[in-house]
Amino acid sequence: MSACRALRRPHSRRRSTVLAAGAALAALTLTACGSGNTSGGGGQTGFVQGAGGVDVVKDKGGRQSAPDLSGKTLDGKDLDVAEAYKGKIVVLNVWGSWCAPCRAEAKNLVAVANAYKDKGVEFVGLNTRDPDPAPALAFEKEFKVPYPSLYDSSGKLLLRFPKGSLNPQAIPSTVLIDRDGKIAARAIKPLGEDELREALDPLVAEK
């Protein structure tokens, strides 16, 4: 009898380990796509909650600089956001083709991108965790996305953001960068069209 118990214990331990690993992976997946968590970690970011769950930094002097966002786009072109869109307001959306809330949000981003193009506002995507560009390119074609996306499968560019400004596990996320290249607002959630317009209008009006 004791021999049977001895044989069962390793199997039981292995099963517990597998179950625990599976639960951890499921939790990470849920957090990574469509999480309502608005925490971006520690750090003094100056964000205050604004309308529609968009966090803003109203004091221009308290805004942090956006990181270097340069690399290859999904279609293989070089893009340096700071250089290409100098003096423009930039809406940076973090997304993945695998993310259902990103799909729901896409039409809102496309509508606002088209509406604000003549107001000095540029949109850029940051595609993450897609192991191959093909599904992401299909996503862009399906939703008629008019702006480029940097391809960041490993999350390297995402991790360059100042501590506390973004939660790398919360996808989709959106960051608004002012004309001086400073982080002015963020949303750690999918955005509606009206929410994005309300966040952009004060930046467009800034002198």
What are these language model-derived features?
Residues M1-S70, E206-K207:
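N-terminal targeting signals for export/organelle localization
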Residues C33, C99-C102:
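Short cysteine clusters
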Residues D68-V90:
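A short beta-strand-turn-helix
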Residues V91-L92, F123:
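Hydrophobic beta-strand anchors of alpha/beta hydrolase catalytic cores
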Residues N93-C99:
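Aromatic-flanked redox-active Cys/Sec active sites in thiol-based oxidoreductases
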Residues R103-F143, K156-R160:
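Structural microenvironment flanking redox-active thiols in thiol-disulfide oxidoreductases
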Residues A138-V145, D152-A205:
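Thiol/disulfide oxidoreductase modules built on the thioredoxin-like
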